[in-house]
């Protein structure tokens, strides 16, 4: 019931702004490296915020603490590898690590076929993607653990076409050597780093502090160049022209978060925390035309912005009985471009009909302060153009009402069926000739 920009996708708690390869044909997530996933189609608790649709937090494997091991997989279009093991003995610190990587190789296969057919010099397959992830855990002592997590993934499209022509006219004694080159470089992807400190303050209180950087960049660079030299009799000369077009969108997201979990009251699990998120947006377009003695530079699009979101949340899970549980919470938010504070109440209920079957209800309000500038009628979404919510636009929000049932099978498979109602306000969409158009409902 939501658009892609209204859903928060995370890896180890870090926001992933472009969670797919090749427009969604391939997932960003390497399934071999996944430990578990926390998914909420709606009605998610107060500890999550920033989106008004759904939440998916993919948690990577911790790594094997006992022995070194690995596996590799080869398919028709890609290869992937995963290795993991305990920290080296010389570190004198218990812990584990995991490294996983993946790359498509149909570009290499197709190029090899083209070379064998004699066409490889003129034509090459232009696209591939790759990604890798690293996770390191260090148990400094029984009460303190540090976790470093990194993800790096790119889609790459490269096109290179060049030619070299010679012309000679014996009657006019004219000779010309002409070279032309056309090149497209188009990388886009996500790069993330995070460091998490978990502190077991006492048996009833756990603190978690998290610092992360998530960077998404899309960069389309096209260059066309022609140059040459000529001779007619005793006269000689040179020439050269170049045209370049550069289109880019860069998001730099820095997040600081702390969370406390307290189990000091019977039948209650209390959580509270704060989050500071600073996001820099840079959307731009540049043209350049040059010849031997003149350069013309145009910059028709240059949108730079910085926003800061500050959030406080608290939630309590109350086990009223062996069959009934409530989850009540709220999230208070400040958006740097707006003067007012926003409060999102959250409520959840779970009733156990029997040991393997439960009924769930969730209600809540959810605010969002960023959007995308993609056309509504876009059929294939390869990349997204993210923008912060302008100061003159009201905050977007949605009210959720979710009712569902869950069934846990004997093999620990969880089946869920839900019906939902989501009411959206102040939506912003891109229309022909306008950057932003507000939809009130």
Task: Locate the predicted segments by residue.
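Outer-membrane beta-barrel channels and translocator barrels
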Residues: 4, 34, 65, 77, ...
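Predominantly transmembrane beta-strands of Gram-negative outer membrane beta-barrel pores used
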Residues: 8, 36-45, 53-61, 68-139, ...
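Short acidic/polar hinge/loop motifs at secondary-structure boundaries
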Residues: 14-40
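Transmembrane beta-strands of outer-membrane beta-barrel pores
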Residues: 43, 60, 74-78, 87, ...
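Hydrophobic, lipid-facing positions within transmembrane beta-strands of outer-membrane proteins
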Residues: 54, 68-70, 77-81, 130-134, ...
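Residue-level signature of outer-membrane beta-barrel architecture
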Residues: 60, 74, 85-87, 138-140, ...
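Face-selective signature of the C-terminal outer-membrane beta-barrel domain
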Residues: 137-156, 183-338, 413-416
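Outer-membrane beta-barrel signature, preferentially recognizing the C-terminal barrel domain
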Residues: 178-197, 301-305, 366-424, 434-435, ...
């Amino acid at each position: 019931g939501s658009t892609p920009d209204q859903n928060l996708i995370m890896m180890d708690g870090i926001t992933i702004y472009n969670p797919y390869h090749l427009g969604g044909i391939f997932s960003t997530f390497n399934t071999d490296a996944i430990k578990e996933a926390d998914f909420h189609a709606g009605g998610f608790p107060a500890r999550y915020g920033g989106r008004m649709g759904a939440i998916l937090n993919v948690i990577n494997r911790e790594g094997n603490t006992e022995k070194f091991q690995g596996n590799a997989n080869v398919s028709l279009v890609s290869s992937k590898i995963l290795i993991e093991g305990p920290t080296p003995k010389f570190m004198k610190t218990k812990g584990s690590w995991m490294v996983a990587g993946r790359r498509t190789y149909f570009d290499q296969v197709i190029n090899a076929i083209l070379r064998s057919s004699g066409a490889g010099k003129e034509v090459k397959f232009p696209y591939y993607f790759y990604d890798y992830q690293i996770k390191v855990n260090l148990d400094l002592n029984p009460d303190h653990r540090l976790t470093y997590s990194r993800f790096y993934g790119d889609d790459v499209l490269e096109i290179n076409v060049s030619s070299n022509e010679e012309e000679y006219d014996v009657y006019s004694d004219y000779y010309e050597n002409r070279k032309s080159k056309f090149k497209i470089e188009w990388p886009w992807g996500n790069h993330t780093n995070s460091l998490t400190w978990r502190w077991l303050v006492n048996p009833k209180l756990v603190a978690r502090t998290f610092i992360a950087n998530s960077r998404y960049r899309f960069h389309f660079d096209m260059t066309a160049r022609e140059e040459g030299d000529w001779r007619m009799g005793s006269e000689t000369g040179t020439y050269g022209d170049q045209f370049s077009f550069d289109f880019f969108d860069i998001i730099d997201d820095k997040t600081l978060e702390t969370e406390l979990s307290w189990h000091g009251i019977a039948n209650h699990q209390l959580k509270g925390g704060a989050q500071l998120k600073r996001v820099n947006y840079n959307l731009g377009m540049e043209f350049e035309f040059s010849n031997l003695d003149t350069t013309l530079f145009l910059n028709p699009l240059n949108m730079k912005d910085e926003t800061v979101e500050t959030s406080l949340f608290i939630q309590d899970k109350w086990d009223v009985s062996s069959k009934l549980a409530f989850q009540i919470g709220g999230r208070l938010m400040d958006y740097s471009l707006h003067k007012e504070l926003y409060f999102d109440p959250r409520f959840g209920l779970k009733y156990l009909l029997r040991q393997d079957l439960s009924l769930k209800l969730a209600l809540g309000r959810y605010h969002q302060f960023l959007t995308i500038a993609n056309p509504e009628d876009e059929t294939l979404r390869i990349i997204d153009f993210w923008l912060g919510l302008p100061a003159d636009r009201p905050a977007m929000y949605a009210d959720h009402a979710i009712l569902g049932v869950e069934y846990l099978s004997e093999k620990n498979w969880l089946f869920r069926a839900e019906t939902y109602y989501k009411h959206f306000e102040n939506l912003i969409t891109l229309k022909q000739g306008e950057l932003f158009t507000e939809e009130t409902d």
